[in-house]
């Protein structure tokens, strides 16, 4: 496509609009228009002084409009309107800007370079990207990230919490946003989400190429291993605190263990923080492996304590057994009150935290404040947790399994945790290993405890037998165990005696202070009397008569010789 521009009736310049030569043709033109000083050619002089190539909106790097760029101080071009109109312009008059735009002398047809400039963001954009591919990727996935169907819903969330955050008809609440148009505000308003109350299958996928585990944590040692995975003692690089990081042994994406891993995360998130439940901090996926960041318990597990006592030939004393039973019962009380059951209570899932108390630190103010004790027992490993109202039971260790669970009778699910707790305390008392099956297994399910080598009080032994009663209805709930007077008698006894001692010391100090003040007052009175001159008999008699309130008025008439 070729055209010509007439100047004074002659051919001034031939313009070539071929797509292949456009970029090469424009660059020399720019160089020629800005650096050429040829005076022999009137065309070159006109191009250099009056007709610079305008910058298109796609190539405008400074955010200026085409009109601002053309009228900038750097350019000598100033279009002068002609009285003759567009068609009657003088041969030497430069083209008007509107006429120049109609000719479309720049970026038409588009070349690969000009199309590339069109994909770049405008200079006024607030978000700066590192590259064009990242920008296009983010823009393409933004709608997918806003889709609520891709968000997991915790199946253990209480119904009251759901009703408080969602309309009864299942619609999301509208949350107005500032500085936004009305259309984004109604993004989720009045929009049905039928699957928002249903638990969806979450696929474990890693979104970042950099390992968060290696970046944020320094692995110290391996402290445990189980069927699900391994547990490592790690220190976080940011805060310098120790954490227990649990990592699955094998990839879980698409496997049957995937729901078990998610169930533990769901339970930890719903339960929150309790002094007798291992604290949960975070969870994420790396290379299809589930990683859970939990509280680090420096005392190990109850199973470790049992094995250590067995090697040394020692037993956990009865007072300590009662404290373990009480604290674990309080943890189960909290779990059961949340509508959940643990379903895998055993010594290896009860962890010990030993607090470093300073010398002279005040003891507990009461027996109910168990969180201030020097040793805390906490329930962990929530991989088998299920809901009481909607049970999806995954059987735990068969050695601690109640008979009704084996018969698939889920009407008294919390009592299964009580049965397992009774056997756990029995093992801590020194009983031998529990059977996995056969007649000895059924013998225990009939309400018989294994042999305990150390002597226990009849009351405590009867309580342990009640925990493993064959009828789940007869087993005491966790609420009753937490208030049991047999367990409460030993807990906080030292603190109670210390409190009474402090009260008696305070009373003694107050009495000593009053006695000292009385002695000082008595001594000062004697000194004042010794300094005074001797009194007459009349004054002494008068002072004596004033002592009695009833006698003062009657005896006053006898004084003075009246």
UniProtKB/Swiss-Prot annotation:
Q: Which reaction does it catalyse?
A: L-tyrosyl-[protein] + ATP = O-phospho-L-tyrosyl-[protein] + ADP + H(+)
Location (main, coarse) = nucleus
The residues that the entry says bind Mg(2+) are: 349, 381
Q: Which residues make up the binding site for ATP? A: 223-231, 246
Question: Is ATP-binding tagged as a keyword?
Answer: yes
Q: Can you provide one Gene Ontology molecular function annotated for this UniProt record?
A: ATP binding
Catalytic residue list: 344 (proton acceptor)
| Gene3D superfamilies, A to Z | Phosphorylase Kinase, domain 1, Transferase(Phosphotransferase) domain 1
Give the Enzyme Commission number.
2.7.10.2
Its domain of life reads: Eukaryota
GO terms for CC? nucleus
Coiled coil segments of this chain: 494-520
Entry's InterPro entries? Answer: CC_SR_Kinase, Kinase-like_dom_sf, Prot_kinase_dom, Protein_kinase_ATP_BS, Ser/Thr_kinase_AS, Wee1-like_protein_kinase
Bilayer-crossing regions: none
GO BP annotations, alphabetical order = meiotic cell cycle; mitotic cell cycle
- PANTHER family the UniProt entry points to: EUKARYOTIC TRANSLATION INITIATION FACTOR 2-ALPHA KINASE EIF2-ALPHA KINASE -RELATED, WEE1-LIKE PROTEIN KINASE 2
Record-stated family: Belongs to the protein kinase superfamily. Ser/Thr protein kinase family. WEE1 subfamily.
Q: What is the recorded name of this protein?
A: Wee1-like protein kinase 2
In its UniProt entry, the species of origin is given as: Xenopus tropicalis (Western clawed frog)
